[in-house]
Amino acid sequence: MSNGTIVQCIGAVVDIQFPRDQMPKIYEALTLADDTSQFAEKGLTLEVQQQLGDGVVRTIALGSSDGLRRGMKVVGTGAPISVPVGHGTLGRIMDVLGRPIDEAGPIESDEKRAIHQTAPRFDELSPSVELLETGIKVIDLVCPFAKGGKVGLFGGAGVGKTVNMMELINNIAKQHSGLSVFAGVGERTREGNDFYHEMEESKVLDKVAMVFGQMNEPPGNRLRVALTGLTMAEKFRDEGRDILFFVDNIYRYTLAGTEVSALLGRMPSAVGYQPTLAEEMGVLQERITSTKTGSITSIQAVYVPADDLTDPSPATTFQHLDSTVVLSRDIAALGIYPAVDPLDSSSRQLDPQVVGEEHYAVARGVQQTLQRYKELRDIIAILGMDELSPDDKQAVARARKIQRFLSQPFHVAEVFTGSPGKYVPLAETIRGFKMIVDGECDALPEQAFYMVGTIDEAFEKAKKLQ
């Protein structure tokens, strides 16, 4: 074990002098010596980011750097940050270092793993084509999820990423009897609190491990907390289990990387992001994968700055995903929730060889009808509906019904909406949209399709409206 001395401290960046022959390696964890000061955080951990030469290393503090000063003693641990893994983590809330923050005693785990691991080799990977039913109509129809696949929920501020994530947790984690890991990366503490109570009420808390590095924490914590959660998920996967891994929010992971990069003095690249953006994203995403022993199905919320999907951060995330669910402010403005854009969202699974001919034909029929409506909108706005041909009028009427039928009451939003949540099986989703596209519902008013589950409910609602 090598001992060092703090020589410079600028915010979260701390430079430490070691003897030249005992320089710690990159990513090694260092801790503040116990007898240093009553003002600094006890047992503060620092992670080596750069070797500056002459025995000096540049580190990022994984905690508050308040109270640090030159001359303080630092001890090298000789290893990267390691966190507890295994069944002892289930039902617990931990921080980036795997320490419990739920005041429920120490974590009982015999094994610790370093948060920096190599991604599985190519010959260990196992591609999956099995569908994962979510019970959310628009997702199951247009951008179906694969078991063991990666899903991104893209959306600007306030269009419903977290609510959609919570509904997916509600529908998948409760139905799927397996284990889940939730990583809260730079999000609101209130959301983490709500999530904990939601899991507790639904009696699935003992199947979820939670790791949080929230908005108010230093950039080092927010940058590493996704890796901590992933390390816990990898352990369960390597035991041969099928794991669900939820990350809210990947953009904050990128943002923490930007902050750390600026503090380390790197030259920024496009839009001020770190020059290592693609590499950092790759390091995380390449590890979130399914092997021949077990699978990780990951669902990641991705904040889109200023609703610009071409921003480097969401654009870098796109290429790693199997399904992309794009939430649109225009659709949210119409009062249609979930505000998923069926023309912008996509999935590799939407292939007739995977989902079957009927599902594929219905999904494409729905998209074609909506696309036709989108093209006709300008004409309708200028000249009105009367100027359209009979075929176009019919297409518009069906598109408006489809648009409303894509809405659905959520279980997690019951407290706000007052209407009970609906879980719609995939077969019912396909049957409902097939009937609308084929013109079997042309006689029904479009209001009958708003916020219902199955097509049968739409028929019942139509009777009440008449």
From Swiss-Prot:
Cellular localization per UniProt: Cell inner membrane
Domain of life of the native organism: Bacteria
Catalysis performed (reactions): ATP + H2O + 4 H(+)(in) = ADP + phosphate + 5 H(+)(out)
Q: What keywords are assigned to this protein?
A: ATP synthesis, ATP-binding, Cell inner membrane, Cell membrane, CF(1), Hydrogen ion transport, Ion transport, Membrane, Nucleotide-binding, Translocase, Transport
Which Enzyme Commission numbers does its entry carry? 7.1.2.2
**CC annotations in GO:** plasma membrane; proton-transporting ATP synthase complex
Which molecular function GO terms apply here? ATP binding; ATP hydrolysis activity; proton-transporting ATP synthase activity, rotational mechanism
Binding locations of ATP: G155, G156, A157, G158, V159, G160, K161, T162
Instruction: Return the Gene3D superfamilies for the record.
Output: 2.40.10.170, Bovine Mitochondrial F1-atpase, Atp Synthase Beta Chain, Chain D, domain 3 (1.10.1140.10), P-loop containing nucleotide triphosphate hydrolases (3.40.50.300)
InterPro entries assigned: AAA+_ATPase, ATP-synt_VA_C, ATP_synth_F1_bsu, ATPase_a/bsu_AS, ATPase_alpha/beta_chains, ATPase_F1/V1/A1_a/bsu_N, ATPase_F1/V1/A1_a/bsu_N_sf, ATPase_F1/V1/A1_a/bsu_nucl-bd
What membrane topology was assigned to this protein in its record? Peripheral membrane protein
Q: Which SUPFAM superfamilies match?
A: C-terminal domain of alpha and beta subunits of F1 ATP synthase (SSF47917), N-terminal domain of alpha and beta subunits of F1 ATP synthase (SSF50615), P-loop containing nucleoside triphosphate hydrolases (SSF52540)
The reply to whether 4Fe-4S figures as a keyword in the UniProt entry is no
Q: Which Pfam families match?
A: ATP-synt_ab (PF00006), ATP-synt_ab_N (PF02874), ATP-synt_VA_C (PF22919)
Report quaternary structure and partners: F-type ATPases have 2 components, CF(1) - the catalytic core - and CF(0) - the membrane proton channel. CF(1) has five subunits: alpha(3), beta(3), gamma(1), delta(1), epsilon(1). CF(0) has three main subunits: a(1), b(2) and c(9-12). The alpha and beta chains form an alternating ring which encloses part of the gamma chain. CF(1) is attached to CF(0) by a central stalk formed by the gamma and epsilon chains, while a peripheral stalk is formed by the delta and b chains.
> PANTHER family this protein is in?
ATP SYNTHASE (PTHR15184), ATP SYNTHASE SUBUNIT BETA, MITOCHONDRIAL (PTHR15184:SF71)
**Family named by the database record:** Belongs to the ATPase alpha/beta chains family.
Q: Any idea what job this protein has?
A: Produces ATP from ADP in the presence of a proton gradient across the membrane. The catalytic sites are hosted primarily by the beta subunits.
List the protein's name: ATP synthase subunit beta
